[in-house]
Structures are given as structure tokens and as C-alpha cells.
A protein has these predicted regions:
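Residue-level signal for inorganic ion chemistry
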Residues: 35, 46, 153, 224, ...
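Conserved acidic, metal-coordinating active-site core of Asp-based
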Residues: 96, 100-103, 107-214, 218-226, ...
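Active-site phosphate-binding/coordination module
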Residues: 27-123
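Asp-based phosphoryl-transfer active-site loop
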Residues: 4-21
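Short, acidic loop-to-helix structural element flanking the phosphoryl-transfer center
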Residues: 21-40, 83-91, 137-140, 191-202, ...
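Asp-based, Mg2+/Mn2+-dependent phosphohydrolase catalytic module
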Residues: 226, 231-266
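Short, structured coil segments at secondary-structure junctions
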Residues: 60-61, 69, 169-173, 226-227, ...
Length: 266
């Protein structure tokens, strides 16, 4: 690891991208470019699968990506690590969701799956069809049903759902983050945004003290707790603040640039 080189990890939504309609502030673009010129390595660290990362983010020229909450790791356009839930567990998830009357969609590195037999499909599925390949797993023939996998999934309980039974099942097998819009982000228990940082730091010969994490929500907590320096955006969920080194201004108020200047990264 070169002297003074740091590894910088950025969440996407609310950190790099503003709220809808998504955009990247010009101050963020310039700060990332300046940090790269100073020799630092820049990584996206997101709950999104790689296929769902916006082209406007990819155009920023990151050195790598931690995707799917640590289930896929890329560097220099090479896939270094990938982990999916085993097929028997994936089938059990589908069956449990059906029993508990909960709609969901399921994320793979290359596509999104959904259960067309669900009475209430997530509205997000219609939007996703314009962004990424989408597939109805209820149409699978036996061979595909017995081999398909996914990395993580989003569940959308409503007032008619048996959330108590489903939560017991989730807690036994997965990690779960409940978002402000009531979506449950459900990820593999052994992998997180933190394990993604650890993997890349080990590969690059960096210590945790050489890592910076930038985030704004509870699913960023693992990486914020692991990184040597953790930075909360100005509009962050208050729950993450006790776990952060520093709170910068909001994304719309040059938050990324201000944090980088504060820590002399640029």
C-alpha cells in the first residue's frame, strides 16, 4: 500500500445520487476526480446489484464495486468474489413469502426475479423493467426451479401479511434492514458492506485505518462501523450518527466535497 493512499467507499442513494430525479452534484464529480489524482482508490459500496447501478455512476470511473451488500465484488472490471443463496434456501424463501402473503423481488448479478403468482406485485417491478432484465420465476419449469439462485431480495409486507412468522424465518437465515418506505432489504448473513471493504483492503494490503466509508442509511451501518473513518451525509438516518466519525453537509450542499476537504483527501 502506497504511503497516504486511502480506500474510499461510497454508498449510492443519498450519498452519490440525489433523491429522484437522480443526479450527481458537480461538486461530487470534481471531488472524486481530485481524490483520484491524489492517488486514492475509489469504490462504490452499495446494496444494489451491479446491473442496477446507474450508468451515470459507472461513468465516474470507480476502481471497483462492492455490490449486493458484499455478495459481489469487482475491481478493474474483474469479478473477484460472488456469493448466492443456495437453491434450496431460495425455494424456501419463495414458499414462505407465499404463505405469509408478502410480495418481493429477488436480485441476481444479471437480472431481477419476481413471483408472478403473487397477488400484489411490487410497483417497483414495472419501473425495473425499463432498467434491467426482469424474469417471472413462477413460470420456471422443474429443472430451472431446482437450480435458480439469487443473492438478496426486497420484501414488501402490507397489512394483510403475516410479518411475525416471516420475520422469524428471516432472522434465522438472513440479515434484514427495514427502510423508511417499509421495504425489507434482506441479505446474506455472512456478507455485508463491511466484508466487502475487508476483502478489498486485504487484497490491496491496506489496514482498516486506511479506509473511509460514506453513507446515509441503516444498511450502511456495517461499513460505517468497520471503516477507519466513517462519514454520515447531512440528511442521514439519525440511527447511524453515533457510529460515525464525522457528519458532513447534505448531498445537495457539497457533502462529499466538504468531507474530503475536512480529512485532507483533496
Amino acid at each position: 500500500m502506497k504511503n497516504n493512499r486511502k480506500l474510499l467507499f461510497f454508498d449510492i442513494d443519498g450519498t452519490l445520487l440525489t433523491a429522484y430525479p437522480w443526479s450527481i452534484p458537480e461538486s461530487t464529480r470534481k471531488a472524486l476526480e481530485a481524490a483520484r489524482k491524489n492517488g486514492h482508490l475509489l469504490f462504490v459500496n452499495s446494496g444494489r446489484i451491479y446491473a442496477m447501478i446507474s450508468p451515470m455512476v459507472k461513468e465516474l470511473g470507480f476502481d471497483g464495486y462492492v455490490c449486493g451488500c458484499g455478495s459481489q465484488i469487482y475491481m478493474n472490471n474483474e469479478l473477484l468474489f460472488s456469493s448466492s443463496n443456495p437453491n434450496p434456501l431460495c425455494r424456501e424463501v419463495i414458499e414462505t413469502l407465499r404463505q405469509c402473503r408478502i410480495s418481493a423481488f429477488f436480485e441476481r448479478p444479471d437480472k431481477i426475479l419476481y413471483d408472478g403468482s403473487s397477488k400484489t406485485l411490487p410497483k417497483a417491478i414495472q419501473n425495473l423493467k425499463t432498467e434491467v432484465s426482469v424474469e417471472d420465476l413462477s413460470l420456471y419449469e422443474e429443472e430451472t426451479w431446482n437450480t435458480f439462485t439469487f443473492d438478496k431480495f426486497l420484501a414488501f409486507p402490507d397489512k394483510d401479511s403475516d410479518t411475525e412468522t416471516f420475520r422469524r424465518f428471516v432472522d434465522e437465515h438472513f440479515s434484514c434492514f427495514i427502510h423508511d418506505d417499509a421495504a425489507w432489504e434482506i441479505t446474506q448473513k455472512n456478507y455485508s458492506k463491511a466484508t466487502g471493504i475487508q476483502f478489498l483492503a486485504d487484497r490491496l494490503g491496506a489496514s482498516p485505518e486506511d479506509t473511509f466509508a460514506f453513507g446515509d442509511s441503516t444498511n450502511d451501518l456495517p461499513m460505517l462501523e468497520y471503516a477507519g473513518i466513517s462519514i454520515a451525509m447531512g440528511q442521514s438516518d439519525p440511527m447511524i450518527l453515533p457510529h460515525c466519525t464525522y457528519q458532513t453537509t447534505s448531498i445537495d450542499e457539497d457533502g462529499i466535497a466538504n468531507a474530503m476537504k475536512h480529512f485532507h483527501l483533496i
